[in-house]
């Protein structure tokens, strides 16, 4: 279903009541979206694979050779997300490049100028070109390798994005198509109500201090950064200064 220029929603199965967009109260910026071009989507609904079972829902979305993907919200361990397994799951202290983060999102951008939002609030898994269907691994000839080189020859990355949503029996997939990545992202923002420009320092460089730093140690770090002319717009204070942290014991009457 076309929702606006460059914005399409495909509904598969029975979407859950609670999801990223279904639980939000927002008004799309339709006037601004109407002023934009209406580019052709990179792929059709028929090219999206969908299946569901007692375990949940699986989607497959096209991915062309050379296409690079970015996104999935805050990712502390990597920038480009092509050829990876991403678990969209909240985690305050991710230790590996698995997709866990403080603010993950079931959303990715492509260098082909489109973005995809899989509207789910569950811990979904995305395989971004790192998996292949068994019937496509060997290619057209499907010949069994006869030596070490043939058996372990690189067959290239997968040609699809696989999405697994546990327990769900369906979901909405939003496709935002633009002239380039920036334009696709703009359509996503406008459709979700538009963004607010934060103060410029909020877009600056953030330095977070060690958990057990005291006020004196934090002040010392700030002075050293300034003395060395190192740019820093924000200092993050970890909750070690609380009486107890996680969950914290912040008490207003002490300040």
Q: Where are the predicted features?
A:
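Catalytic and substrate-binding clefts that recognize carbohydrates or anionic sugar/phosphate headgroups
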Residues: 1-199, 209-211, 215-216, 222-227
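Aromatic-lined carbohydrate-binding/catalytic grooves of carbohydrate-active enzymes
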Residues: 193-255
């Amino acid at each position: 279903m076309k929702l606006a220029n460059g914005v399409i929603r495909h509904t598969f199965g029975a979407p859950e009541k609670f999801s990223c967009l279904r639980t939000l109260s927002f008004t799309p910026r339709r006037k601004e979206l109407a002023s934009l071009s209406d580019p052709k989507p990179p792929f059709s609904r028929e090219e999206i694979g969908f299946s569901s079972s007692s375990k949940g829902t699986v989607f497959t979305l096209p991915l062309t050779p050379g296409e690079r993907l970015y996104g999935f919200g805050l990712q502390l361990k990597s920038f480009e997300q092509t050829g990876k397994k991403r678990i969209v799951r909240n985690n305050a202290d991710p230790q590996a490049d698995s997709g866990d983060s403080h603010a993950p999102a079931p959303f990715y951008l492509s260098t082909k100028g489109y973005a995809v939002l899989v509207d789910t609030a569950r811990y979904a898994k995305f395989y971004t070109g790192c998996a292949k269907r068994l019937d496509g691994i060997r290619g057209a000839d499907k010949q069994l390798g006869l030596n070490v080189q043939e058996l372990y020859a690189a067959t290239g990355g997968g040609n699809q994005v696989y999405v697994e949503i546990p327990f769900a029996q369906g979901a909405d997939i939003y496709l935002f198509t633009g002239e380039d990545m920036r334009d696709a992202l703009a359509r996503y923002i406008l459709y979700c109500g538009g963004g607010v420009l934060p103060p410029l320092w909020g877009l600056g460089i953030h330095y977070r201090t060690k958990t057990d730093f005291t006020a004196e140690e934090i002040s010392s770090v700030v002075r050293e950064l300034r003395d060395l002319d190192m740019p820093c717009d924000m200092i993050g204070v970890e909750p070690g200064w609380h009486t107890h942290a996680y969950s914290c014991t912040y008490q207003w009457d002490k300040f």
